[in-house]
Each structure stands twice: as C-alpha cells, then as structure tokens.
Amino acid sequence: MQSIFGTDGIRGRFNEEITYSLAYKVGYALGSNLENNNPILIGRDTRISGDILLHAITKGINASGKKFINLGICPTPAIPFLIKQEQLSSGIMISASHNPPEYNGIKIFDHNGQKITKNFENKIQKFIEESNQNISVTTKEISLKANKELMDIYMKSLIQSMGGENLSGMKIILDTCYGSATTCAKKIFQSLGADVRVLNNSKNGLKINVNCGSTNLEPLKKALRQSPADMGFSFDGDSDRVIGLDSKGNVLDGDHILFLWGRELMEQKILTNNLLISTQMANLGFEEAWNKIGGLLYRTDVGDKYVHDAIKEKRAVLGGEQSGHILSKINNFSGDGILTALQISKYCKKKNITLNNWLKTSFEPFPQKLTNINLNFNINKVNQKTRILINQTTENFQKIYSDNCRIYIRPSGTEPLMRVLVEAKSHKKVDSLSSEIANKLILEINKIMN
C-alpha cells in the first residue's frame, strides 16, 4: 500500500484519494495508537465533504475506545492551540487548505499541538495496512454537537495577542473566502474596534477558495477600489495563511510580512540572531534587503512543516512562507492567518503609519514568475525509479539555467502539477525563461513517463 501521507497530512479529491472508509480507518488507527486517554479534538472547514469525513473519523475514534470533542467549523490553528491549552491527547483538522472544493484532507496533531512526526505517520500507515481486514464501519450513532465554549477560548486568545492595543479608527476589509475564517474573523476585528467590511463571509463548501481568498486577490482589490479602506486581508480556506493589501491595492505577501514584522522584533532586540526562516520560494529582493539591515535568512524546502522544523532547530522566533503562512512564537509556531492580520494591523496603529507607507519601507521584489505545469499523474505516487529520474531532470534544469537568475522547480505536494519558479532582475528575462523552461521540462518528463 502506497503511503497515504503527503507533504501536509493526507490530501486528495473526495471519493477518490480521500474516502469515507479511509477516514474511518485513520480515526480508528489514531485512537488505537494513542497512549493518552484524553479526548481527541476535531475540526473542519466548510467543504461539503467535511461533514461526511467528520462522521467517518469520529466513528473510527469511537470504535477504538477513545473519546473526541467536535470543534465544528474552525480555523486550522484553533486545533493545535486548544490541544495544548486543554491538555488533549491529539487533534485532527479536516481541510484541504487553499485547494479547490472537490479536495479535502486530514491533518493530525500530537499532544503538543505539533504536526505528527514521520515516524508516527508510518505507525498509522502500518496499523491501517495490518488491520485492514479487521476494521468494520459501525452503524452506532454518536453525538457531533460542536463545542462553542472552546471556540470562544481560541477567539479570546487572538484578542489577547494584541497586548491591550485596539484597532479603533481603522477601516479594514476581510475576504474570508467562504471558509473557516467566516466563523470568527469579523467578530474578532470588530471587538477590537475596527470598522470592518467582509467579503465572501458565508459558510459555503461549494465556493470555498473559488475565485477568492489568498490565492485570488481580485475580489479584495475590487472592494478596496469601490470602498476605500486602510487595508485588506484575504485568508485561505482553513485560515492558516493570509495575504494583505494596502489602501492602494499593493500586495503584502508573506515575504513582506516577515520583513516588516521581523524588523520590528529586531529593533526590540528580541529576534534571535536577527534570523528569519523562509523557503526556497522567498524573493531574492527580500533576502538582499534583509541582509542589508543586518539580518540573516535561512531557506528550507517548501512547506510550513519544514519552516517549523528549522525554527525549532535554529531557535528562531519568526518564520514563514511567501504564500502567507507565518509562524511566530506568539502561538507556538502554528500558522494563523487571523493572528498575522491582527499583528500587522496592530503595528500600523501603534506606529501611527499607514500600511501603504510602511510597505514602502520594506523592499522591492525581484520579478518572479511561478508557472504550474499540468501533469496527467501525481509525481508523489509514481514508483521510486521514475521519481528519481524526474528529480534528476529538475536538478539539471536548475543548474543549466542558474546564471544571473534563480530557478526553483518542485512538484506540488497535493495536485498533479510541477511548479517552476523563475526569478531575475528583469520581467522580460523572467517571462522568456519561464516559457522556455516549462516547454522543455514537460518534454523531458513525457520522455521519462513514456
């Protein structure tokens, strides 16, 4: 049996890679392998399939003899926060993050609120394989009433992260993209005194991430043009990432957030070794500007778990990804889009500066283009020999095209895509190289597959 775990838990199209049966088995395997008898916390985003998978997982947990608490629809970061806060044994988030509505996923957290280790993933996998014939889906009905009190505790923690600061006098637009942020983002910002307008704020599992949210900023840009505000924030489906816009529609991505937030911590002398952690996707303009003010940038592979591991290893206090996953010491390094948006808003209010003017003090990004090459297969599911050949091909391309530019090629961890990042000092060079590399790379991959 091929590994059910990818780069960020289990993810795939519902009723294809992610099924009721698999979800039941994961719940059963997790419950059976936990020594701690405290309840397992479960949450989900708004996807239609989320309710079906919730039923399956909870029945599996129940069959294993363990108890669970249903948090209902919630941001992913609520799960790790509450696991630690309430001393629970583990947690599961049912979500496919920024992926389209037809996808779903299962993220598992340990008793410390950290994503489970590779070793524990292997343990779950082995248990499912060995118990495959013995697991039967029970018909016993169990209560799935959502625990609103725990959700209130999470929301209060975000308000408390402001350290007594408020957002009165600030006009802010939020795009909650029909996802998890619909449960609490508006309420939190309003409770802090902000004048809030919210887009796509209904729980709609058919529209989650569709032409909205952190991967499509057009609705937020349009709203800022039609109804001026100080800033806007766009979340993804499970609210663990955020992208901002200033009053003029300029983009505040994860690189800008790290630079501005990191510089504040540096000035307060609480940024360990002036070090930030980011990934291979981080813009070279960001790195050069950060180095110029005395900072260090350590790059990891793409994925917040790699950033998290490097933060722990290097004893850093801040890290993240260009995509808007920001991990800070405030909440034990769990990516939280709402927390990040609050911190950026707080600094603007405290410094008495507009986001537009603050953003101008950061850096000028190098032209950068990310091209998605559609494959008719998921590279993570091909045999090892084929995967090695494809990896060797991408490494060769990165070496061949490394003069006067930066190339980074990687497969998507969740979709049948190869992502090609090209970065150079001119848009013309970026465009021509992106097209050339994408065309040649797909030919080479097709040769390997045929």
UniProtKB/Swiss-Prot annotation:
Active-site residues (renumbered): S97 (phosphoserine intermediate)
PTM comment text: Activated by phosphorylation.
The cofactor remark states:
Binds 1 Mg(2+) ion per subunit.
What domain of life does the UniProt record list for this protein's source?
A: Bacteria
Cross-referenced Pfam families, in alphabetical order?
PGM_PMM_I, PGM_PMM_II, PGM_PMM_III, PGM_PMM_IV
GO annotation, cellular component aspect? cytosol
Q: Which GO terms describe its biological process?
A: carbohydrate metabolic process; peptidoglycan biosynthetic process; UDP-N-acetylglucosamine biosynthetic process
Q: Does the keyword Signal apply?
A: no
Its keywords, alphabetically, are: Isomerase, Magnesium, Metal-binding, Phosphoprotein
Task: Write down the InterPro entries for this protein, in alphabetical order.
Answer: A-D-PHexomutase_a/b/a-I (IPR005844), A-D-PHexomutase_a/b/a-I/II/III (IPR016055), A-D-PHexomutase_a/b/a-II (IPR005845), A-D-PHexomutase_a/b/a-III (IPR005846), A-D-PHexomutase_C (IPR005843), A-D-PHexomutase_C_sf (IPR036900), A-D-PHexomutase_CS (IPR016066), Alpha-D-phosphohexomutase_SF (IPR005841)
Write down the chemical reaction(s) this protein catalyses.
Answer: alpha-D-glucosamine 1-phosphate = D-glucosamine 6-phosphate
Cofactor dependence:
Mg(2+)
Task: Tell me a Gene Ontology molecular-function term this record carries.
Answer: magnesium ion binding
- Binding of Mg(2+), residues: S97, D236, D238, D240
* E.C. code: 5.4.2.10
Residues recorded with modification Phosphoserine: S97
Q: Which family does it belong to?
A: Belongs to the phosphohexose mutase family.
Known function: Catalyzes the conversion of glucosamine-6-phosphate to glucosamine-1-phosphate.
Q: Which HAMAP family match?
A: GlmM_B
Q: What is this protein called?
A: Phosphoglucosamine mutase
Origin organism is Prochlorococcus marinus (strain MIT 9312)
